[in-house]
Swiss-Prot record:
Entry annotated with the keyword Protease: yes
Gene: pepB
Organism, as annotated: Escherichia fergusonii (strain ATCC 35469 / DSM 13698 / CCUG 18766 / IAM 14443 / JCM 21226 / LMG 7866 / NBRC 102419 / NCTC 12128 / CDC 0568-73)
Molecular-function GO term, any one: metalloaminopeptidase activity
Alphabetized UniProt keyword annotations: Aminopeptidase, Cytoplasm, Hydrolase, Manganese, Metal-binding, Protease
Textual note on the cofactor: Binds 2 manganese ions per subunit.
GO term, biological process aspect, one: proteolysis
Taxon lineage: Bacteria, Pseudomonadati, Pseudomonadota, Gammaproteobacteria, Enterobacterales
Location of the active site: K207, R281
Main localization, broad class: cytoplasm
PROSITE patterns the UniProt entry points to: CYTOSOL_AP (PS00631)
Domain of life: Bacteria
Protein name, UniProt field: Peptidase B
Cofactor: Mn(2+)
């Protein structure tokens, strides 16, 4: 590999010859990033994206001013799904270097897992990768159970089984227990539930190509909560947390579920399927029932659930929904501390009743009369959370994946949200 390009930081503006808007300049010693104090982390990330665009694949972060957050901002912009890159990191104190190394290990795992093609990453592979990551950081403090295929039906996981039965690759439920207490009877502090749809064709409510071409990333919620648990463990999480990943393909076949089918869940709820492309909520319902049964203080589910959230927020924010104002405030405070983008969207009691069905208690999608799709999706999920008004957060992961590069990000997964959830778990 070529000699490293030195990247230094300066609080002085660039020479006037570079223009008044210049955020970096080039000299004989390398490249200098000119920080202005307004959005230094964003400036570093955008500059790193430009440096990668120049074809520079080996850099050395040099000089004063670098800390773990600034190094991480550079890497977020510099990393891309194609090619190899090498960064020589600056000298950091032990705590900051450990924090940076943990981000590189875990959040890069999240990005790489979401970017993996569906042919490589099916439901079973996703579950096993999650087990491997958590076991790597937690060792013998972890136990897990994987339930798949017809065993799901036999055990009453009808949402997950129904959605996944149309694929040759069996649907899978991962139930993982991180218990650092050593006490098998220790209370469960939190449950994390992730949507793990490893490819979403839309089923018989089939997607157009322009909406299907990124659907390998529809397991982004599962990857995010897995990464969050792993990252929280590296930050010293000392409470019992359970992880439920609901993993399946949503495909078309002679055995696939159909419009008008009715699913009966273990909590007695009957759901009429009127859109097979609203499958994420059907699989999450099974995970939320299991999570509620643990009686935890906190339930967080994460899912690339609706296009409506992306319409509202683009790919710039994750959408947050909760009936618990205090808990939502804590999550937003964690997001601010970690410099990650979350935005709260409305969720009210009336959203729970905006899913009418002529044949069942619930419809899996709102009608044209109720167009607040992200809020009605959250309302649907609330029917499967035993105490939905307290201790439950729903994250619609609209910032998980970008179909095209922008000034701060390459195309593909971002890893956003991992640090925020981990922060909340360890607060």
């Amino acid at each position: 590999m070529t000699e490293a390009m030195k990247i230094t930081l300066s609080t002085q503006p660039a020479d006037a010859r570079w223009g008044e808007k210049a955020t970096y300049s080039i000299n004989n010693d390398g490249i200098t990033l000119h920080l202005n104090g307004a959005d230094d982390l964003g400036l570093i990330q955008r500059a790193a994206r430009k440096i990668d665009g120049l074809g520079i694949k080996h850099v050395q972060l040099s000089g004063e001013g670098w800390d773990a957050d600034r190094c991480w901002a550079f890497w977020q912009g510099y990393k891309a799904p194609k090619g190899t890159r090498k960064v020589e990191w600056p000298d950091l104190d032990d705590a900051q270097r450990q924090e940076l190394d943990n981000r590189l290990m875990i959040i890069d795992w999240v990005r790489d897992t979401i970017n993996a093609p569906a042919e490589e990453l099916g439901p079973s592979q996703l579950a096993q990768r999650a087990v491997d990551l958590i076991s790597n950081v937690a060792g013998d403090r972890v136990t897990y159970r994987i339930t798949k295929g017809e065993d799901l039906r036999d055990q009453g996981y009808m949402g997950l089984h129904t959605v996944g039965r149309g694929s040759e690759r069996s649907p899978v439920l991962l139930a993982l227990d991180y218990n650092p207490t050593g006490d098998k009877e220790a209370p469960v502090y939190a449950c994390l539930v992730g949507k793990g749809i490893t490819f979403d064709s839309g089923g018989y409510s089939i997607k157009q190509t322009a909406f299907m071409d990124s659907m390998k990333s529809d397991m982004g919620g599962a990857a995010t909560v897995t990464g969050a648990l792993a990252f929280a463990i590296t930050r010293g999480l000392n409470k019992r947390v359970k992880l439920f990943l609901c993993c399946a393909d949503n495909l078309i076949s002679g055995n696939a579920f159909k419009l008008g089918d009715i699913i009966t869940y273990r909590n007695g709820k009957k759901v009429e399927v009127m859109n097979t492309d609203a499958e994420g909520r059907l699989v999450l319902a099974d995970g939320l029932i299991d999570a509620s049964a643990q009686k935890p203080e906190l339930i967080i589910d994460a899912a690339t659930l609706t296009g409506a959230a992306k319409t509202a927020l683009g790919n710039d924010y994750h959408a947050l929904f909760s009936f618990d104002d205090a808990l939502a405030g804590r999550l937003l405070e964690s997001a601010a501390q970690e410099n990650e983008p979350f935005w709260r969207l409305p969720l009210a009691e009336f959203h729970r009743s905006q899913l009418p069905s002529n044949f069942a208690e619930l419809n899996n999608t709102g009608s044209a009369a109720y167009p607040a799709g992200a809020s009605t999706a959250a309302g649907f999920l609330s029917h499967f959370v035993e105490n939905y008004k307290q201790g439950w957060l729903h994250i619609d992961c609209s910032a998980t994946y970008r179909k095209a590069p922008v000034e701060q990000w390459s195309a593909g997964a971002t890893g956003l949200g991992v640090r925020t959830i981990a922060n909340l778990l360890t607060a």
